[in-house]
């Protein structure tokens, strides 16, 4: 029955225009997704090549390699895209373009994870997918080309050129939230082959933490709704430790499974002033007081979140260079 005869079919549970609508009848309408970009070799703009690799029936990744010399070993950069747990893709231009340029600038093997999206696949699906993808990357350690004959699920770029002593994990917004939860898990569970995460980047991390500063009604609605959409039955709701890292039952931040961490903050979100400064300040203070033994860097930019991905402004280029310098350890 269509909407002309059944008016209830157009009733929404969530109307987050201009991005996504979720209807009571179960339909999901994604109003904004950037164009799909196919795999390519020797990109004329950057010299980077990329391909899409299945990891399991539910998870895949886009793997990137820059122009390099034979036998050169490169850091491995695993990226988790943001966009509300429910939009975009590793294969679409918005995040793909960023990763492509980042791979060219930093000379890394890039692995951009294609995880399942809410609301079709509610959390913790994305958390599990990204852990599975990270374990897949780690499973390449110690292999050589001879291993490819018996391991059809392995990627030769990672085997031949990946330096597992320089494994980095990064994400933006909800992707940074996934990275945070992955770091917690990596501190408790071993990656395959004993691989360790050297460093991680949280770009505008998505946390919900009560603070003394009240968010405006509109900002609070738009900020918190993506968690409610992605994990409507989360134990504890917005006090679930996966979204509130200082909740009473949250894992100890001292257990982060990496040696270096860069937290990057911005002042604007799509030209709207960001109101999460206090949230991230509480998180950073909690991490500093936790006893975590790693090296923490904080970069606070008077810039819009989107500037990093468009690279159309000098500030966007400055943010890009700051993230790149962390990977280069400059």
From Swiss-Prot:
Gene Ontology annotations of biological process type: alkaloid biosynthetic process; indole alkaloid metabolic process
Binding residues for catharanthine: 84, 305
EC code(s) of this entry: 5.5.1.37
Effect of residue 274 to N: Slightly increased activity
Protein task: Component of iboga and aspidosperma monoterpenoid indole alkaloids (MIAs, e.g. tabersonine and catharanthine) biosynthesis pathway from 19E-geissoschizine, psychoactive compounds likely to be used in the treatment of opioid dependence. Catalyzes the conversion of dehydrosecodine to catharanthine.
Subunit and interaction comment: Interacts with dehydroprecondylocarpine acetate synthase (DPAS).
Name under which the protein is recorded: Catharanthine synthase
Gene source species: Catharanthus roseus (Madagascar periwinkle)
């Amino acid at each position: 029955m269509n909407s002309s005869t059944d008016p209830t079919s157009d009733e929404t549970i969530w109307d987050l225009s201009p991005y996504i609508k979720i209807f009571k009848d179960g339909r999901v309408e994604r109003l904004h997704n950037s164009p799909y970009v196919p795999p390519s070799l020797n990109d004329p703009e950057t010299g980077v090549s990329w391909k899409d690799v299945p990891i399991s029936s539910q998870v895949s990744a886009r793997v990137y390699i820059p122009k390099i010399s034979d036998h050169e070993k490169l850091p491995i950069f695993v990226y988790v895209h943001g966009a509300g747990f429910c939009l975009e893709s590793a294969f679409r231009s918005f995040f793909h373009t960023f990763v492509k340029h980042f791979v060219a600038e930093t000379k890394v093997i890039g692995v951009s994870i294609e995880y399942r999206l809410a609301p079709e696949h509610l959390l913790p699906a994305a958390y599990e997918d990204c852990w599975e993808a990270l374990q897949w990357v780690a499973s390449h350690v110690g292999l050589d080309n001879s291993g490819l004959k018996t391991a059809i699920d392995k990627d030769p770029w990672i085997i031949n050129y990946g330096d597992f002593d320089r494994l980095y994990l990064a994400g933006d917004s909800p992707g940074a939230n996934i990275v945070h939860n992955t770091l917690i898990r990596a501190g408790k569970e071993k990656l395959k082959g004993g691989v360790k995460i050297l460093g991680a980047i949280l770009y505008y991390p998505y946390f919900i933490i009560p603070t003394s500063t009240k968010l405006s009604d509109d900002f609070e609605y738009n900020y918190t709704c993506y968690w409610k959409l992605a994990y409507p039955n989360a134990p504890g709701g917005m006090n679930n430790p996966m979204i509130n890292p200082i909740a009473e039952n949250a894992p100890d931040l001292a257990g982060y499974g990496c040696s270096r961490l860069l937290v990057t903050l911005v002042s604007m979100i799509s030209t709207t002033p960001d109101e999460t400064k206090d949230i991230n300040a509480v998180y950073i203070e909690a991490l500093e007081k936790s006893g975590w033994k790693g090296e923490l860097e904080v970069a606070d930019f008077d810039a819009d979140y989107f500037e990093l991905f468009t690279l159309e402004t000098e500030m966007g280029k400055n943010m890009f260079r700051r993230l790149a310098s962390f990977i280069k350890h400059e």
